[in-house]
C-alpha cells in the first residue's frame, strides 16, 4: 500500500510540475534574446577564456562574484554554441523553476489548483513584483539559478531540514550574491521565529558563513585589483552614476525628489492588508510563516525609508535593497490565495468554478497570444532576427575588418541590430554599451566617461575621437550619417547602415 501511495504522489508531483511549466511557458519560451542574456553569456565566455577579450569590449568586467553563473553559462556556450545554449537554458531553467515552485508549495501545503492560480496571478498581474522591476520567471540569468535554489531551500526550511537548505543557499550565493545572501539571512530569521532548535540555527548560520567565505574573498579581491576610480571631469559620484543615471528603475524610487513607484506601492499596501487579515484571523496553517512574510513586508518599508534618506548620495544603491520584492510578492500570493481557497471558495462550489474558469482562461489566452512567435522561433534566432541588409553588414565586417578593431554603434537604434547584440554578432569590440554597466567603482567611472564621449561623437564633436581612440563607427540613420560625415569617411553601406572610418 505504501508503494502504491508513493507512486501516486510521484505521478501527482510530475503532473504538477508539467502544469507549472505550461503556465510559465509564455514568459520562459525563448522567443527573443534579452539584453541581459546577451551580456551574461558574453561575460561567461570572457571569464572562461579571457585571452581573446580585452577591455575594449563593451561587455567586459573584472567582477568575479558570479563565478557559478560564469562556469555554467560559459560551458554551455562552449559545448552547445551560443544560440543553442541560450535556447536550451531557457527550458532547463523553466523546468528547474517549476520543480522548485512545486516543492515549495507542497511544503507549504498549498493545493495544486491554488498554487497554479497564484502563479498565473503572479505572472500576469504586477509584472512579477511589487516594484523595482524585479522578476523570477523570464530569461537565462544567474539570479534565476539562484531563485531555483532559494525556493528549494524555503521548502526544506518549512519542513525543518536545515542542513540541506544551508548548502542550497550557499550555492545560490555563488550564482547571485545578493539573492542567495538576502534569502539565507531571511530564512534564518524564519527559523528563529518558528522556535527552531537554537543550536541547529547557530550551527547552520556558522556553516553558511564558512561556505560563502570564498565568495567574500572574491568580492574583496575584485575591488582591490583595480585602481581607484578617476572621477575627474564628472558631475556625479560613482554611486550616483550607478543608481540615479543607470539603474533608477531598480534602486532609486525617489529620484528628483518625488516617488516613482506609486502604483506598485498601492499594490504592496493592498496585499500587506490581506496578509494582516490572514494573520489576525489565523487563516493559514503556519502562523509563523505568515508572520515572517509580514516582517519581510516591513523590511521593504524600511528599504523605502532608507532610499529616501539616501536619495542624494545613493551610497546603498548598489546593494539593490528592493530585490526581494519579487519572491516576497509570490510568497504573499500563496498565503492569501490559500486562505481564500480554504475559507471563502470552499463554502461554494459555484465560486470555485467561476474562479477556476477565470484564471485558466487568462493562462490559455496568454499562451495563445504567444504561440505564433513561439512556433516561429528557432535556436539560431540571434542571427535570424536580422534582415538581409543587416546580415550583409555583419558578413562584410567579419570579412574585411581586422579582429580587435573597435567599432562604435549608437544606443537605442530601435532596430533588430543594436548595441546589445552587435558585439556578439561581429565578434569585434564596441568599447561601451548603455545596457551593460560594470559594478566595480573603477569600471563604472570608465564606463560613464566612454558613454559621454561616444554620445559626443554621434553629435559630430570630432575631438572626442582621439579621447576614445577609435577608428570606426556605425551610423544607423540619416541624422547620424550627417554627423559622422563631419568626422570621417563612409567605408561600407548596407541599406540605412553606413560604416565610417573616423579621422
Predicted regions and their residues:
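Membrane-interface transmembrane helices that cradle and orient dolichyl/undecaprenyl
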Residues: 145-164
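Signature aromatic-anchored transmembrane alpha helix within multi-pass, membrane-resident enzymes
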Residues: 209, 343-373
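Short periplasmic/luminal acceptor-recognition loop of GT-C membrane glycosyltransferases, typified by
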Residues: 387-391, 395-455, 459-480
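Membrane-interface junctions at the ends of membrane-embedded or membrane-associated helices
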Residues: 1-10, 158-164, 191-203, 330-357
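Transmembrane helix irregularities
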Residues: 79, 157, 171-179, 213, ...
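Active-site lumenal/periplasmic loops and adjacent helix-entry segments of GT-C-fold
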Residues: 10-13, 23-98, 104-119, 128-146, ...
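Transmembrane catalytic cores of multi-pass membrane glycosyltransferases
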Residues: 25-41, 45-66, 82, 177, ...
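Transmembrane-helix signature of membrane-embedded glycosylation machinery that interfaces
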Residues: 101-110, 157, 340-344, 397
Amino acid at each position: 500500500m505504501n508503494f502504491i501511495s508513493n507512486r501516486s504522489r510521484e505521478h501527482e508531483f510530475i503532473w504538477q510540475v508539467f502544469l507549472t511549466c505550461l503556465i510559465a511557458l509564455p514568459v520562459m519560451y525563448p522567443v527573443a534574446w534579452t539584453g541581459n542574456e546577451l551580456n551574461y553569456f558574453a561575460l561567461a565566455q570572457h571569464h572562461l577564456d579571457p585571452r581573446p577579450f580585452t577591455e575594449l569590449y563593451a561587455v567586459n568586467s573584472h567582477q568575479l562574484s558570479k563565478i557559478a553563473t560564469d562556469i555554467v553559462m560559459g560551458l554551455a556556450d562552449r559545448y552547445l554554441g551560443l544560440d543553442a545554449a541560450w535556447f536550451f537554458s531557457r527550458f532547463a531553467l523553466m523546468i528547474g523553476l517549476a520543480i522548485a515552485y512545486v516543492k515549495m508549495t507542497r511544503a507549504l501545503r498549498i493545493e495544486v489548483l491554488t498554487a497554479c492560480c497564484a502563479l498565473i496571478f503572479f505572472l500576469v498581474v504586477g509584472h512579477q513584483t511589487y516594484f523595482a522591476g524585479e522578476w523570477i520567471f523570464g530569461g537565462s540569468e544567474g539570479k534565476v539559478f539562484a531563485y531555483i535554489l532559494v525556493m528549494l531551500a524555503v521548502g526544506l526550511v518549512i519542513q525543518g531540514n536545515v542542513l540541506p537548505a544551508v548548502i542550497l543557499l550557499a550555492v545560490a550565493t555563488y550564482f547571485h550574491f545578493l539573492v542567495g545572501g538576502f534569502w539565507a539571512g531571511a530564512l534564518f530569521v524564519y527559523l528563529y521565529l518558528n522556535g527552531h532548535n537554537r543550536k541547529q540555527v547557530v550551527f547552520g548560520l556558522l556553516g553558511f558563513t564558512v561556505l560563502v567565505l570564498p565568495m567574500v574573498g572574491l568580492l574583496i579581491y575584485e575591488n582591490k585589483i583595480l585602481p581607484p576610480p578617476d572621477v575627474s571631469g564628472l558631475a556625479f559620484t560613482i554611486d550616483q552614476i550607478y543608481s540615479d543615471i543607470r539603474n533608477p528603475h531598480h534602486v532609486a524610487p525617489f529620484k528628483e525628489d518625488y516617488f516613482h513607484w506609486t502604483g506598485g506601492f498601492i499594490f504592496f499596501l493592498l496585499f500587506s492588508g490581506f496578509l494582516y487579515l490572514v494573520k489576525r484571523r489565523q487563516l493559514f496553517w503556519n502562523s509563523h510563516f505568515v508572520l515572517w512574510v509580514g516582517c519581510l513586508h516591513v523590511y521593504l518599508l524600511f528599504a523605502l525609508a532608507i532610499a529616501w534618506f539616501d536619495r542624494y548620495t545613493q551610497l546603498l544603491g548598489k546593494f539593490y535593497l528592493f530585490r526581494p520584492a519579487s519572491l516576497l510578492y509570490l510568497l504573499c500570493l500563496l498565503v492569501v490565495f490559500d486562505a481564500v481557497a480554504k475559507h471563502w471558495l470552499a463554502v461554494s462550489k459555484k465560486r470555485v468554478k467561476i474562479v477556476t474558469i477565470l484564471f485558466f482562461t487568462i493562462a490559455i489566452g496568454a499562451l495563445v497570444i504567444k504561440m505564433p512567435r513561439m512556433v516561429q522561433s528557432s535556436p539560431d534566432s540571434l542571427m535570424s532576427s536580422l534582415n538581409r541588409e543587416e546580415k550583409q553588414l555583419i558578413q562584410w565586417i567579419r570579412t574585411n575588418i581586422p579582429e580587435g578593431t573597435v567599432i562604435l554603434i549608437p544606443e537605442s537604434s530601435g532596430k533588430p541590430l543594436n548595441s546589445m547584440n552587435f558585439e556578439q554578432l561581429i565578434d569585434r569590440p564596441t568599447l561601451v554599451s548603455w545596457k551593460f554597466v560594470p559594478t566595480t567603482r573603477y569600471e563604472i567611472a570608465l564606463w560613464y566617461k566612454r558613454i559621454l564621449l561616444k554620445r559626443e561623437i554621434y553629435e559630430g564633436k570630432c575631438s572626442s575621437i582621439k579621447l576614445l581612440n577609435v577608428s570606426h563607427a556605425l551610423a544607423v540613420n540619416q541624422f547620424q550619417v550627417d554627423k559622422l560625415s563631419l568626422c570621417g569617411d563612409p567605408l561600407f553601406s548596407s541599406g540605412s547602415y553606413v560604416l565610417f572610418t573616423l579621422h
